[in-house]
Each structure stands twice: as C-alpha cells, then as structure tokens.
Amino acid sequence: MQKSLVSLAWVFVAILGAICLGVLALHKGESINTLWLVVASACIYSIGYRFYSHFIAYRVLKLDDSRATPACVRNDGKDFVPTDKAITFGHHFAAIAGAGPLVGPILAAQMGYLPSILWILIGSVLGGCVHDFVVLFASIRRDGKSLGEMIKLEMGKFVGMIASLGILGIMLIIIAILAMVVVKALAHSPWGFFTIAMTIPIAILMGLYMRFFRPHKILEVSVIGFILLIIAIYAGKYVSLDPKLASIFTFEAGSLAWMIMGYGFVASILPVWFLLAPRDYLSTFLKIGVIGVLVVAIVFVAPPLQIPKITPFVDGSGPVFAGSVFPFLFITVACGTISGFHALISSGTTPKMLAKESDARLVGYGSMVMESVVALMALVCAGILHPGLYFAINSPEVSIGKDIADAASVISSWGFSISAEEIREMTKNIGESSILSRTGGAPTFAIGLAMIVYHILGDPSVMAFWYHFAILFEALFILTAVDAGTRTARFMIQDLLGNIYKPLGDLSSYKAGIFATLLCVAGWGYFLYQGTIDPKGGIYTLWPLFGVSNQMLAGMALLLVTVVLFKMGRFKGAIISALPAVLILAITFYSGILKVMPKSNDSVLNNVSHVAQMQIIKEKIALTTDEKALKTLQKSFFNHAIDAILCVFFMLVALLVLIVSVRICSNAYFKNQIYPPLAETPYIKAA
C-alpha cells in the first residue's frame, strides 16, 4: 500500500512538472509568473535525481561500497582524506559553480526565456549531471587520477599528450573569461573596486588568524571575514561619494586587466593558507548562503518574467552575442547545462575526498543539479528586468553608443521601448555612474537580485547596497577560481615542460613554478587584455570561443567514460554517456565549423566567423589611411586569427579523441579486444 502511494506521488510530480513546463512553453501574454518555472524545475530535478541518477548508479556504474575509495586506501591527511559526503558536496559545488552558470543564461536571455529553460532543464538532467557523475566514478576507480592522465591510460600516450595540450588551452580560455566578468563588473565603479580590493587584506588577515591564532576554526574565521566584508561594502558607498577617493578607486577596463594579471600571478605562487584557502572558505559560505536566500526570495516574491518567451534575435542578429539559436544557444548557456571544466574538478580534488563510492551520486549528479538551479536563477534575474534595460546593460557600446538618450533610442527601435529616464533612474538606484554596456552577466545578475530585495523591503534606497553585495559575491568566488585555475594550469604546464626539460617539471622547484606561472598568466592574460580593448566588449567574441572549447572538453570526457564502460562490457549502459557525447560534439563541431567559415552574404554568419571577420578587416585595412585606426584593425585581425587557430586546434583534438574512442569501442564490441587494457585499480575491500 505504502509503495503504491509513493508511486502515485511520483506520478503526480511528473504530471505537475509537465503542466508547468507546458504553461511556460504555450503562454502568450507579455509576462509570466516565475513560480511556473520554480515548480517545473523542482519536479524535473526531483525525478531526474530520484530515478535517472539511481539507474546510472546501480544499473550502469554498479557502485560498490564494499570497495575502498582512493581517499581510504591512500589516506595521508593532506590530499587524500575520507570526508563526510555533505562536506564533499559543499566543496565540489563551490568548486564547479563559477561564473559560467551566471553569465551564460544571462547572455542567452537575448533570445527569450523559453529556449534557455528547455535546454537547462532537459540538458542538465540527461547530460550535465551525468557527465559530472560518471567522470567522478571513472576517477575514483583510477586512484583519483586527472582527466588527462585517464585519457592517456585508456586511449594511449599520444592521445593523452595531445588531449592534455587541448585541456591546457581550454583552461587558459576559461580563466580569461572568468577574469573578464570581473573586469566588466568593476570598470568605472569605485564602490565595487574598493570593496573587492578590501577582500585581499581581509583574506590575508583570515589566513594569519587561522594559521597562528585559531587553527582549524573555519566557521569562526569565516564569520569574522563576512562581518569585515559587510563593513567594506558600507565603506565603499562613502568612497564612491567622495570625489577624491572615487577618482583613486576608478579604473578603465584595460588597467583592471593588468591588475588582475598581477594578482593572479602573485596569488598563485603564495602559500595556499595565506590567501587562497581563507578566500575559498569565505566564498563557499557566501555562495551557498546567497544562493539559498535567493531561491527563497524568488519563491516569496514570485516576480514576473518580463522578457519575451522568444525574441526576434533567435536568428542570430542580437547585439549581446553572435550566433543563431542553433547551435549557439547551447554553447552560450554552457556551464548552466553541461561543462567540461567540471570534468577537471571531478577528476581533481573531489575523488580524493569520497569516503564511499555511493557518495558519488550526491556529489557528482546532485552538485550539477544545484548548478543548473543557479543557472535558472540567473535567467530569472535577467528575465525580471525590463527588456529594454536588459539590452542597455548587455549590448556593446558599438551597438548602442555612449549616450543614454542614444542608447534608449536604439534599443526602442529594436522593439523594446525604454526611455532615457528609466535607465538613469536605475543607474541612480544602484549607486553607479553608468550601466550601459556592462556585458558579462555580473551587473545584470546583481541588478536582478537588488530588484528582488527591493520588492521584499519596498525601499529603493536598499538597491545600491544589495547591488554591490551581489557584485562582491560574484567577484569573490570568480577571483578564487582565477587563483585556483592559475595554480592548476601551472601544474599542467610543468607536467608538459617536464617532458622537454626534466627540471621544469619539478613541482618542488620554486624557480620552475614561477616560470610556469609566468607562462600561464601570459596565456590567459593575453585573451583578457585583448577582450578589454575589443570594440564589441570582449564577451561578444570571447564567450562563444569559451563555449565551444568548454563543450568540446565535456564531449571528450564523456567519450572517455564511454570507452571505460565498453571495456567493462557494459555496452547497453554506455548509452548514458555516448548519447550526450554525440549530441554535444555534433553541436560544438557545427558551431566550431561556423566560426572558421569564409565570408558569405549572410551577415549573421559573418559576425560568428573569425575567418570572415579577418577577411572583412583586411578589406578595411586596404581602405584605411589613419594610422591609429590602422593599428586597431591590425590588432583585431591578429586576435581573430589566434581565435580561429585555437578553434581549429580544439576541434582537431576532439576529433582525435573521437576517432580513437570509436576504434577502441568497436574492437571491444565486435572483436572482444581490449587495448589499451582497462586501467581500473585492483579491488581492495573497504575497512
């Protein structure tokens, strides 16, 4: 009887979710209540976790708690430590939930709310959550090895070496785009810059406090750090109101890029306990706390989505990012649905912390469910804004101009009527000098959060504080990701350089570490700086390249797991990784090809393609006589050439992994030949 009631309850959940999703898809009004989205997502995620993740865990992967995990076998109290699954879940979620789920859906909102909602909900349950879960499983069974090492073991040394080069390149693009989000949020914002600058001495104070005064008191020091952050936000307001202080803390995007490069270099060579660890604790508590409060606030306020279900920009003519709904929506949403970056985390620190194999279900699948919830919240923050305001914030200066009146006129001509006064009022309410062309996701998310708080408290004067709190919240964990990403990429560079000159691969060598860090920062710093001087704002051209590379990395990770499952003889079960791998690679190969197509009569495709842009710029160079304009065009030509080369390189790496994967799987299925042999570690019984 009880079993029947439970089954009926799940049937009700499924029907309720389908009805809510149907309402979102078929609604024809100007706005729709966000509660339809909240209920639909709760139902779909519940069903996905309860049934699909259970099927994967016990019918496909066959998780075995009697088998000792790497954390138990190699417990050293440092890198390998068996940890409670709730703590491991928090660590893993904090590590994967970077800027991606906040930025991608906000950019994709230019096409309307419906395409993003469908892709986030369906794609994450069947693709992204599966990706994180199965890569974590593969790493657990291989002594916690990294993605590159696992590809080398399961597909051969040559493929592993090429894949490692590709992974490093993708990592540098990821760090650059993370830093770009911070630059876009802090440019010309003395309040924001002062607050973020204060987090450095606060983090150092926390590190010293925990190292020498109160060791291991993580909660205590995080509370102290949080109080100091709130004080810094309040102080930032008075800094912005004082003309002299405001001028000291106001910087152009280019200057901020150099500062972040310097910060990334210094932070990644300092001892972890001095800056990175305390900042990580603080950002983790902030991240989980803010997201939890925001979910409750959205349910409580239930603001209407004002952005249309589908906008005219599905054809790719939108100002925020280049490309049509297929395939560029998928690579734009990126981390909100599936992210190759997560494969690096799922094969990094997390597999070294799991106490039992069954914990991988909550940590791997469950954390990605939470990340896609963050993506939906970001979409809500963008969607509740007046569409005209959304485009004012996210359209590049070259499209709408510098003047508020001009921007309002241009945006209104697109069919999203807004007055200059409405833009000025929002600018004043959040305590900024301008909100025009602040593409990057962070300002849009922050304004959306501030508006939700305003609806609760009913006082517009609170918006400035909550806007800057949200900027602090985002910048804090993004800069933590920049620290950690630079450190991780440094290890990758040293591993590769060690094959050329052995001393450079010595991780204990301070000089080798500094040299590798310089190469790393130069790599991502180049893309960051070029993005800041890009006339379209950097995000317009960098984010699609990030999306293509990130999704290709996810495809390669899923191919690795498919190879592993075929070697284990689980041919039918391998469809759980093979199907999303084929879909993701098909989408990214198509988008990658479009990005290197020659010039055509289609203006949308020309905006997407780096090669087409090179041809257009070459024509302009031939007609330009002004020396300054000529230098700008030559720089732009060079940048597009680099982006095109990288795009082709990433596609070739993914194609190599795909070909080798097909060969290994076909040999295993048709000839029963397993080569290279399965690299799974021997079974050791758990204590």
UniProtKB/Swiss-Prot annotation:
InterPro entries: CstA, CstA_N. One of its GO terms (cellular component) is plasma membrane. It comes from the Bacteria. The keyword GTP-binding does not apply. GO terms for biological process: cellular response to starvation; peptide transport; protein transport. It is a multi-pass membrane protein. Keywords: Cell inner membrane, Cell membrane, Membrane, Peptide transport, Protein transport, Transmembrane, Transmembrane helix, Transport. Belongs to the peptide transporter carbon starvation (CstA) (TC 2.A.114) family. Involved in peptide utilization. This is Peptide transporter CstA. It comes from Helicobacter pylori (strain J99 / ATCC 700824) (Campylobacter pylori J99). The lineage of its organism: Bacteria, Pseudomonadati, Campylobacterota, Epsilonproteobacteria, Campylobacterales.
